[in-house]
Amino acid sequence: MKKNPKILTKDLLAEIDNLVEDIQIKGVLSQKQKINSIFAENVIPLLFEIKTSVEIENFSQNDLREKINFCLANTSDIVDIDSEYAPFYSRIRVLRENILLRISGR
């Protein structure tokens, strides 16, 4: 019997919610306008789109992969500006892996 490493949808959705919440809290505390605008304009909206797509299970693998990769690339740019944001990059990388596992086990 082959065991599928499928990530539970509710855990994935909770991780997205926690990540967005932590990004928003960090934004309020840090007051770094350029970084906050990158998160607010590029990363957070895509994370919510990903969450909605996973929640209703209405997505194409390529679309979801493209969105999470774009989030990762933007967060990498943020880390280049300020390495203090490296934990968010790591969390989005883990989220990316979990999403890829989730969609491959669909």
Question: Predicted segment positions?
Answer:
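Short terminal alpha-helical segments
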Residues: M1-A40, I103
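Amphipathic alpha-helical binding modules
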Residues: E66-R106
